[in-house]
Amino acid sequence: MIRTGLLLAAILATSLRADPFDDLRLKRYAMLTGGAGIDYSLPQIHARLSGIESSARGYWRTLQKDPGRETLWPDLASAASSAQITSAWSRLKAMALGWATPGQNLYGDSALVADIRSAAAWLEENRYNARVPREYDNWWDWEIGTPLQLGDLLVLLHGQLTPEETARYAAAIDRFDSDPRVMIVKTVSTGANRIWKCMGAVLRAIAVKDAANLQLASDSVDAVFPYVTSGDGFYQDGSFIQHGRHPYTGGYGSSFISQLADLLQLLAGSPWDVKDPARDNVYHWVFDSFQPLIYRGAMMDMVRGREVSRAGSSDHAAGHAAAAGIFRLSQLAPNGAAAQIQSMVKEWLVSDTSRDWASGIGLDEVMPVAHLLADNGIPARGEVPGSWIFAAMDRVVHRRPGWAFGIAMHSSRIYNFESINRENLHGWHTGDGMTYLYTSDLTQFSDGFWPTVDPQRLPGTTVLAGSMPRSNQVGGSPVAGGATVDGYSAAMMQLGPPGGQLNARKSWFLLDDAVVALGSDIGSSAPDQHVETIVENRLVSGDAAFTVAEDGKWACLGGNLGYFFPNGAGWKSARADRQGSWREINAGGSPAGITRRYQTIWFDHGAAPDGASYAYVLLPGKSAAAAAAYAAAPEVKIVENSSQAHAVAKAALGLRAVNFWTDAPKTSDGIWSDRIASVLVLEAGGAIQIAVADPTQANGGAIHIQIDRAAAGVMEKDNAISIDQMSPALRLTVNVANARGRTLKLKCATW
């Protein structure tokens, strides 16, 4: 029989005489168990409750109950693994959720709560307590992972634990998380780590009514709100960095925003409410950092770091987790921002047909989100076309109706990839210019892609075949970035991976209906290894058609993805089934084999090339007929693909774009620069726009630009731009000192 009210009523009755600590405890209890007003007939609620019960029963069934036990679960028997300690507390929390959550059959089960108490006592006695002399294995489990699980356990089992039990568990948390500002003994905590530690400290303080520690935890949140210019945190351009030099918006950044939302909502209205005025920056992060990177509910993998190697953490799972945190934030936002945020979340959820909308949403949020989806007064936002250069993390996003495109680079500022804790073991080339094309094929990167794709042939990359560089390595050049104007971009990367045997100059020009990829100056000092540039390596189903022109000028995959090769034949392709396992890329993954089919397209530059090049154009959404028509009359002109400059033009848009590769005077397509620069010129509607960026972020002076066009008057101008001449050619001095890769723009009227 399902009990739905007696225990909850008894717990909530205490609120009639509650102090602020009790209010916070009850609020957290409601966040975990769903709170009042749940519609148990809603399929999503029923599914969530069934999942809670199933999980709790599974752990309860396998729990070792013998008084002489040496472990709680057979698969968590190690006394040397900190991760197993966190996992054990996580399982006990899952069991406690089963006991504490109304609407399913374990609610209020006395035998279950007795076994939870007994197991928790064993775990405190034998693994995690205030008497442990020092942390071992992974600090994260001691200071973050376990405190978060144990803290929630104290909330869920309040009234079932004796004061002595509560004190012991709280003392264990305090032993390792007494000051959220510090981690690993004396390191200042930052980013997601700071927020996690604050939440752990808050939960402990609630349990033992420690006002001083609760105030410390609340005050410690303030440090994350200001924008940063180095290290961990959010940057003005929307980037998010964790672990010093890793792009992590969709990993640690997503955890950051979700945990922060929980924390702010929990403390709202209490004596410990977080009131720093800078907290309003979080609403800017939602639009500047997360909005560009979530496409139809999927968080782009290029900002998820080593999490891509986790079987249970797909791009859609990560996107929904971020959406849940962002929705919770919307309930704290000013009215105007709240409606905008909820419209955005609605778009992500309704456009993602690959996953149930309630996946990843807290039980207490299912009803509010259901109401949002049914509310015609808040429409789904729709697609947001645009281009974003995330200069602080060497990432680029381009979005057009029906598709989105991402570029993952690295430089002397940003690491190539992260592989710690035996995760992301094949991430060798994910930062070497890997490109991600998102279309209506929503599961392209979530259906076993990472364990089965050839890690030596990732789309967009130029690779020394067989090379396996170490993780946490910076590149040999500072050049990685680009410029953007009116939704179009030019991006560039000087590829010089660790090892020093390969070099390449790579550009992408991101247009209205195409992506132009150019490469030059490709060289290698390895005599026996071929160098390849990978155009595509796409997961396909069944016998998806791959049509190729006789002259090699164009190809089409699946009837809706075109490729144009300006130089005709000279590229290669193959279709093959590949097998892999999650264990191969993550030590904690399953060893079970997975097979997926791929269509691969690449250029083989041969062994030890010197000055090799490539050019291709991606045509998302184009059929074979449309690709053939494009090849017969290309809409984009490749003006230059040399060691000095890469340049393209599209007359129909009035767009010219040049990436300059040297600190020497150079003219390409009527645009002159004296320094390394990314430059776009857009002429339309009686105006000319010039966008300039320093992709090195190392130029402490200026870039001088000349455009073969006269201008009549200034309409808009960045303060860093000085106009030296308006006619007969437009001459500019662009001060890029401290611009940090930001695009600087000028808009003038034309004659």
Residues covered by each model-derived region:
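Extended polysaccharide-engagement surfaces of secreted carbohydrate-active enzymes
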Residues: 263-689, 693-715, 724-726
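Solvent-exposed serine/threonine-rich low-complexity stretches and specific carbohydrate-binding patches
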Residues: 717-727, 731-735
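Aromatic-lined, polymer-binding surfaces characteristic
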Residues: 42-45, 57-311, 316
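Hydrophobic h-region of N-terminal signal peptides that target proteins for export
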Residues: 9-17
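Intrinsically disordered, low-structural-confidence terminal and linker regions
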Residues: 18-44, 748-751
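C-terminal beta-strand-rich structural cap/linker in extracellular carbohydrate-active enzymes
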Residues: 392, 562-564, 612-615, 729-751
